[in-house]
Amino acid sequence: MRRVVYLVGLAIGMCMLSSCAAISRGDAPPDDMKSPDAALVYGYVEADNDNIVQVDFLQYNRLYVSPFKAPPRVLVFDDGVFMAENIKPGNYVIAGFRSERNNYNLSRSKRQSYQHIFRIKPGDMHYLGSYNLHVTQTGKIEYGDFKVTELERPGEREVLMRLYDATEGTAWQDKIARRLKELRQ
């Protein structure tokens, strides 16, 4: 009897873990727009011989203590496109990227974080850019063991076209369509 209870608990735990992994990989659908002041932050990231699964997107000068306060959710899709929806206005920073094998920490101190702050305004659509992470020294990845290069492609338009399909049925899709129209002109 105890073994059955143990196996059922193990099965439930595995299901919960797999659902968390799906959310971090962008398999979960984006949430609908919660208010007109909510912002959308998006971009693209790739790593040489590595698959980025998480973007550490944090509000600057905010302490996140699990389970009470969590950082904004960032969906990372298999093609490297990422998005964070329903972002409140404020100052934010990309603290790093995580892959299945490595952590790419972009800032190790408050001073380094301060140099990369960007401001989100109410109702903003903020494109962070497209980046490549190149490991310069093999072994344990620490700050300085990799190089971040800005890419020309995919550009904002290509990233938004991918997100247009991913946000089907939400108010974000209309907002993305308007931004795509602006970029065509």
Where are these regions (language model features)?
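Bacterial N-terminal signal peptides that target proteins for export
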Residues: M1-V8
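Bacterial N-terminal signal peptides
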Residues: V8-S18
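Primarily secretory-pathway and cell-envelope proteins
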Residues: C20-S66, N102-Q185
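Short, acidic Ser/Thr/Gly-rich low-complexity loop/linker segments typical of extracellular
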Residues: F68-D78
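Beta-strand-rich interaction surfaces with strong enrichment in secreted/lumenal proteins
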Residues: P71-R73, M83, Q115-R119
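Short, solvent-exposed coil/turn segments
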Residues: F77-G80, R111-S113
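Short Pro-Gly-centered beta-turn/loop motif in secreted/extracellular proteins
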Residues: D78-N91, F97-R101
